[in-house]
């Protein structure tokens, strides 16, 4: 190990301990709460201390541990990370086994629903990539796509009424991005027969509601057309017995890693309009998988 690596490791360790002391100080003195492992995890998420989050999760804490305060019974670490817009914490929690479809009370408020509600496109993208069910409905029978559509029309109505607005607010831009991500995932899921045959839960009341919305809403239909164009492109890219579309839907990083040296595969994100981010996430995973195999 080089001197530079030793120094960097030492700096990381010192930084970790300083942050741990500050988190404990914040919990005990500023917040006047009990010092426990759950509070340490939630406070670390709040302050974006990914090193503490990883250290706590490595020690075996439940990544779905409830929020310490009973009045926030719907909150778990994943939902809290979404409310803090902490993408690194979301990824760490998922890697250590956080349930992307979890909900802790009768409202059936899932992490995906919270991401849509808070207007976090990146959070929505991450959750869907790692298996969040787009067809789960709340106790009021609302799907994430329906929620995003309602927010969109409320925002547009507000813009029409308030004539002082000259630029499109960020929240409206984010909402459009979220709707595009949700529609793209729904269309991608529906395009793969093997996936649908394995998971009959997708054929539910939520699925039927989403299907109707995507087929009737003017805005959602526009996104749907873009998705279908991308899907046709990916269907025609063959990797052995499978198309690139099958590999993307099923997140088959093992198979994709065997083709990762092919520049045409690496250039696929440039040929599509909607699925760029998801394809790049899959390619990154395949590259990491390939590098690990080379080392081993």
Curated annotation (Swiss-Prot):
Presence of the UniProt keyword tRNA processing in the record: no
Keywords: ANK repeat, Repeat
Xref: Gene3D superfamilies: Ankyrin repeat-containing domain
Cited Pfam families: Ank_2
Presence of keyword Repeat: yes
Highest taxon, organism lineage: Viruses
ANK repeat start and end residues: 73-102, 107-136
The protein's name in its UniProt record: Putative ankyrin repeat protein FPV216
Upper classification of the organism: Viruses, Varidnaviria, Bamfordvirae, Nucleocytoviricota, Pokkesviricetes
Family matches, as PROSITE patterns: ANK_REP_REGION (PS50297), ANK_REPEAT (PS50088)
């Amino acid at each position: 190990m080089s001197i530079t690596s030793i120094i960097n490791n030492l700096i990381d360790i010192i930084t970790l301990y300083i942050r741990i002391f500050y988190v404990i100080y914040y919990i005990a003195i500023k917040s006047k709460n009990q010092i426990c492992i759950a509070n340490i995890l939630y406070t670390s998420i709040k302050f974006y201390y990914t090193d503490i989050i990883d250290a706590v999760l490595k020690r075996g804490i439940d990544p779905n541990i409830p929020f310490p305060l009973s009045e926030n019974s719907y909150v778990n670490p994943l939902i809290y990370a979404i409310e803090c817009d902490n993408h690194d914490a979301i990824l760490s929690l998922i890697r250590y086994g956080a349930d992307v479809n979890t909900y802790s009370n009768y409202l059936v408020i899932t992490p995906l629903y919270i991401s849509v509600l808070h207007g976090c496109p990146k959070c929505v993208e991450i959750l869907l990539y790692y298996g969040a069910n787009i067809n789960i409905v709340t106790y009021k029978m609302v799907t994430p796509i329906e929620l995003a559509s309602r927010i969109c029309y409320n925002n547009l109505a507000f813009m029409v009424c308030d004539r002082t607005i000259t630029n499109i607010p960020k929240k409206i831009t984010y909402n459009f991005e979220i709707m595009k991500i949700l529609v793209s995932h729904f269309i991608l899921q529906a395009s793969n027969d093997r996936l649908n045959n394995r998971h009959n839960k997708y054929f539910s009341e939520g699925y039927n509601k989403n299907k109707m919305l995507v087929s009737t809403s003017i805005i959602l239909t526009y996104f749907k057309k873009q998705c279908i164009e991308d899907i046709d492109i990916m269907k025609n890219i063959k990797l052995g017995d499978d198309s690139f579309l099958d590999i993307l839907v099923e997140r088959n990083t093992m198979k994709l890693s065997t083709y990762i040296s092919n520049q045409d595969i690496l250039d696929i994100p440039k040929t599509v309009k909607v699925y760029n981010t998801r394809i790049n996430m899959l390619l990154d995973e395949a590259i990491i998988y390939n590098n690990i195999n080379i080392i081993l």
